[in-house]
């Protein structure tokens, strides 16, 4: 790797609890550089990086609490024992270095070109041969058998955590939830009550993983074992065989997410898996899968963990199945197969595109022909009141695996002291529309002058962004940079523009903005959802179907709840990007503005929000974080993004009542 490993006695983490003779645990800043992000979750971001001149993947954890830091050191201890260079296993993503000292805690792994197995199945719509499925299953089972021998339970096996190399060999990654079996049992014993069941605190820390891959005993709040990993393995291999997201009949993951929400609540799905024995639809014999493979999958997801085979048994059975598969099955190295399922040298798919860059480039490339004079020049400058702003934000994935929200804060926009802009974009069916919009909308706003009113500027920015994004999407689909079929990402949007003492808020969808006016909530937005009779009537007049599905009114085959958005080209023109703009004159009665995605408003009322800020130190970033974390604690199932803007001077030492 080109990075020297210090002597073991000095090669240790900042605490001294981690040490290694195989990999460096602290690195000089000049030896590595982080490039572009590859993936982002609630607990970490993975970057493409350079280490000693070589391409690697760098995992940067989110360390918000001392527990997070403890977890980093535990994971590092586990990884360098399991994955040091001298104990390399071909089925595991290899740890090659770490930086275990502040301020940049990092882990470096071998780099694998995207996509992971989940994106390979659901984005590229890869149809592997049965031979390929069995070979991948065998390699994965061997890696999990190796972990089991070492006494380790992975606890989060799913296609998204399986990396595929150029020869289609799998490499298990993301050991963020992995634990030694003895440690899981130790924690459980400490938390058991006289009833013999773990406490609620234990459940919250240990009922981890991804719901559709979690074994029934975990959903019943028992502890993880090797057999829990066996269950997740079976769900994943069946998904590879069928090509559909578990418990749906859809290939596209973003669309399947919507279908799952429409079909089951989380509690209903849990009950069906545990009590009714619900499992994903098993691959059909017509797929070419031998009965022995289908039988193995069914035994692996048996409701009784004791009836499931061990990974040692699974590996032996898969070897036998491999020998009996027809010789003329497509081999992993078949050039014809590579051509049919996607050239291995080209890894373009929708998330590989930088939609952030696309939005910024489009705004810059479509400048308006006008002389620049600013809105602040045309408003009454004799007004004695002008708000004094301080601002902050906080964003979290919440209970979702991926982050589809984006936001921007542009205080003193265009270097004007009385001109400020803030915005939140809540993506659905992927993050592409939200990423494009977060650069395009403020880019357009910067170009408008006093000949266009702020209301018209906001409206035009939304509409132009919508058109530009949909045209860009079509362009990339035609050029094959996007390979997924029937992909129609969109986002809701709320943007606030403060011009001297006037506030303008544009909204399309179900994000919200409220003012604290004289101690009472003053709404600056109205939700645009199909449950609103006026919005529903407008959609129907445009010729698009609105029907009651599961729990609410939804629009079209995509079953969207919102009736206005940027993107969603399959539902245009009914689901319009035309925002509703509300304006008001600010006064000393206006204390702060709160903007948030629906992940907050799903579990909090306007009054709740004001009350929480009242009881929080008056620092906008801290208030934003308090609101988001409280929403997560109340059970919000969505991404949560919050912006708080104080409109008059506040002291962080202000007394809390």
Curated annotation (Swiss-Prot):
ATP binds at residues 38-46, 59. Mn(2+) 2 binds at residues 426, 598, 638. Its EC number is 2.7.11.1, 3.1.3.16. InterPro entries: Kinase-like_dom_sf (IPR011009), PP2C (IPR015655), PPM-type-like_dom_sf (IPR036457), PPM-type_phosphatase-like_dom (IPR001932), Prot_kinase_dom (IPR000719), Ser/Thr_kinase_AS (IPR008271). Keywords: ATP-binding, Hydrolase, Kinase, Magnesium, Manganese, Metal-binding, Multifunctional enzyme, Nucleotide-binding, Protein phosphatase, Serine/threonine-protein kinase, Transferase. CDD domains: PP2Cc. Residues 32-327 form the Protein kinase domain. SUPFAM superfamilies: PP2C-like (SSF81606), Protein kinase-like (PK-like) (SSF56112). One of its GO terms (molecular function) is ATP binding. Pfam families: Pkinase, PP2C. Disulfide bonds: none annotated. Binds 2 magnesium or manganese ions per subunit. The active site is at residue 156. One of its GO terms (biological process) is regulation of intracellular signal transduction. In the N-terminal section; belongs to the protein kinase superfamily. Ser/Thr protein kinase family. In the C-terminal section; belongs to the PP2C family. This is Protein kinase and PP2C-like domain-containing protein. It comes from Oryza sativa subsp. japonica (Rice).
